[in-house]
Amino acid sequence: MSINHFNNNKNNNNKNNKNNEENFWDNTQCNNDRNKFSIDNIINSNYPTANTTTITSTTNQTIQNNVLNSINIKNNESLKNIYYDENLQRKLTSINFLKNLCSVRDQPFNFNEHIKSIQSINSYRKCISNEIFKKNLINNQLSDILIIIEITSFIGDCIFEIFYLNYFQETLEKDILLFSNASETICIPSHHSPSPQFPVYYTENINNATPSTVVSNSPNNYSQPISPQSSQSTTPTIISSNSPLKTRNKNNNNNYNNNNNNNNNNNNNNNNNNNNSNNNNNNNNYFNNNKKNKIGDCNSNNSNNNNNNNHNNNNNNNNYNYNNNNNNNNNNNNNNNNNNNNNNNNNNNNNNNNNNNNNSNNNKNNNNINNNNNNNNNNNNNINNNNNNNSINNIINNNNNFNNNNINNNLFNNNSMNYNKKENYNWESSSSEEDNNNLIKEQSVKKNETVKKQYIPRKSKYVNYERIKKVSLSKSVEPFDTMKRMEKKKPGNCSMCNIKESISWIKTMVNGQLCNACGLKAIRQIKIEN
């Protein structure tokens, strides 16, 4: 689009000039052809400057009032009423100007057109800088304020499009070197440049300005919320509901074990760091003193701990409520733990480690235990958390834990690629022994069921049938549906998966070639090793 525009102007204005092709992109020609997109034209189309004769006293007074009012109002106002709504067309014009410049990005590769595009980019950079230099020479103070607003907003619209052009130019030079011998148009995949960061537009409250989403009219039609982070955003990993890495949290309160992908907070020495989704920077700890896990049943302990060692381990596997208070280094020696128990007693413990029982007993031990029962026994209902995090009783059933070494995040072992022949997997953690027994019964019943046999052709010493079965089951590919027979020929290399000796020449209805490893149809021009 932009190249055609420049070429049309070139042909209309310089028909008899033989050196148009060489001199078209110099500064002189650029200054002659840039009037439509110049900042002069853009600003004058919205606000008359001090040098124009068409300005009226009414318009000048209105502009003065708007500027002075915006300057005098310091809070809860912005400069939006001066330029944003009125100059929306100017913004669109500036974006379209750059859009036309770099529209060649979405076109097939063409050597000559890309060279012209790079030259036009460099020329228009000079044009923009010259216009900005001119506007800085204006002496009228009121016009200076308006022009600064106009130019600043114009640059805000253009500079990140130029960011695209910089990236595009770098990749373009590589393409030119790569396809320098090409004389015709070649279609190549388009380059995906990183999304730029746009400047924050003024909001109604300039003091509470928040990032907004700016939609650009560039060819890529990107839309990105403004953030101070890097322009190259990282895509979060999405784990599907059928993934073996996703375990359903049956306990409560979203307590995850980041080490073993299970819901137990008792198998690691670093439980106080990794087992809870609670933020350690929060000094408000909530304790469940009753057997019901409700918000209304929680009592807040507002003790200030500099070490943030207070963690809530709420595990409801067996309806046990654990209150683990590890106050290692408390600034306050008087830790007032207000427990709404049956005795309703307030105890002032001068020890750094407090044992809060329902009987309100003060035990000088190194363990903080909040027992809902009236016993200090270390039974299955209690957890002893030492200050050194050395001894932790494993109370939750080991059936809730998955061994990551057996799962390996895949159905196959990375070394031997042995297919796990279990027909069904229960990736959810069972919360009781009864669930495990039911699972064993279901699996035993399914093993006795008759399974429909898959058609397998006559055996060949060049075909690894176990590997074919494994891959076809994992990728839901059935490579033998259209097969009639197989010929014994020496295998070659697959062009899809690049695995040596994985191609066996197979005659199908379309006489194609089928890879035994990936189950895909390879390119027909593949060479067979002798």
UniProtKB/Swiss-Prot annotation:
PROSITE patterns: GATA_ZN_FINGER_2
Species assigned in the record: Dictyostelium discoideum (Social amoeba)
Zinc among keywords: yes
Alphabetized GO MF terms: sequence-specific DNA binding; zinc ion binding
Zinc fingers (GATA-type), renumbered ranges: 494-518
GO biological process terms, semicolon-separated: regulation of DNA-templated transcription
Keywords noted in UniProt: Metal-binding, Zinc, Zinc-finger
Spans annotated as Disordered: 1-27, 212-386
Keyword Disulfide bond attached: no
UniProt name for this protein: GATA zinc finger domain-containing protein 4
Family annotation (InterPro entries): Znf_GATA (IPR000679)
Biased composition range(s): Low complexity: 7-17, 216-290, 299-386
Lineage: Eukaryota, Amoebozoa, Evosea, Eumycetozoa, Dictyostelia
